[in-house]
Amino acid sequence: MNINATLLGQAISFALFVWFCMKYVWPPLMQAIEERQKKIADGLQAAERAAKDLDLAQANASDQMKEAKRTATEIIDQANKRKSQIIDEAREEAQAERQKILAQAEAELEAERNRARDELRKQVATLAVAGAEKILERTIDKDAQKDILDNITAKL
């Protein structure tokens, strides 16, 4: 092989080209590649964090739904218990009112019965006195009649 000046010039030119590329072209290219790699790595990490956050949010949402269902069930159970309690209280009050009304009615009935008996006794006594008066054909004065009526009424 023959080494001449052209080959030597080409080697020097190539070396200068490589040095120029290494000094001025290569660092910005490497920096751009590194920035791009960093952005991709950050994007992947962000995607992983987002996936973890999504899983965590879904787990929290599921827990909150379970808690809300449990709370709703408790509220419904308390409402049903309160409803039963109110119904029982209303039944008890109605039963007490019923007993009160029945007792009042019985008392009124007994009072009316006693009034009717007294009235009947007075009428019987008056009839007895009138009959006795007719039998005796004489008039009894009012005081004597009242004494006789009271006496007969007490015996009846």
Curated annotation (Swiss-Prot):
Organism (species): Vibrio campbellii (strain ATCC BAA-1116)
Relate the protein's function as given in its record: F(1)F(0) ATP synthase produces ATP from ADP in the presence of a proton or sodium gradient. F-type ATPases consist of two structural domains, F(1) containing the extramembraneous catalytic core and F(0) containing the membrane proton channel, linked together by a central stalk and a peripheral stalk. During catalysis, ATP synthesis in the catalytic domain of F(1) is coupled via a rotary mechanism of the central stalk subunits to proton translocation. Component of the F(0) channel, it forms part of the peripheral stalk, linking F(1) to F(0).
Keywords, ordered alphabetically: ATP synthesis, Cell inner membrane, Cell membrane, CF(0), Hydrogen ion transport, Ion transport, Membrane, Transmembrane, Transmembrane helix, Transport
Recorded hits in PANTHER family, A to Z, give:
ATP SYNTHASE SUBUNIT B, ATP SYNTHASE SUBUNIT B', CHLOROPLASTIC
Q: Does the keyword Membrane apply?
A: yes
Tell me, in one coarse class, where this protein mainly resides: membrane
Name this polypeptide is given: ATP synthase subunit b 1
Which is one GO molecular function term here? Answer: proton-transporting ATPase activity, rotational mechanism
Pfam families noted in UniProt:
ATP-synt_B
Q: Does the keyword Ion transport apply?
A: yes
